[in-house]
Amino acid sequence: MTKRVALLAGLDASALEHVYAERLRPNPGAENMIAGLQAHGIKIALVSGGFTYFTEKLKMRLGLDYARANTLEIIDGRLTGRVLGTIVGAEGKRAFLHELCQTLGISTQQAAAMGDGANDLLMMNAAGLSIAYHAKPAVRAQAHTALNHCSLDGVLALLGVSAA
């Protein structure tokens, strides 16, 4: 992560807005899934090995309850090529799950975690329910269940929750 971020040194921070506007799209069914889960009092968090610039915008746009990602250092409108704070990787995702469950006053066994890559596995293994979403084979093999051929709102049927 640090080597990849270092390549961004000197880039004008406005490039992040361009990436967000032109390339970032929620997965199909995201809005329906979020609305359906929240209508039943379920809290939604986005935890990503990506960057807070994007996750905070998605949090606001989609009405998510929580978000955690890596913070890019920006000085005088330019990326420095450094990440501030602890890097959110596999261990960071698991730690966030534990932290969030503590904040919500629930056990990790009462939480569900969904992911698609190897850096999601520690978090998914710590949750009471793990869902592989269009995931790599190794992730599907370790998850409690997998959604391979549907949109994100397939989670509603999986959990027996009606749409909002």
Model-derived features with residue positions:
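Short, compositionally biased "basic patch" segments
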Residues: 1-9
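C-terminal cap/substrate-recognition subdomain and adjoining C-terminal extension
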Residues: 9-164
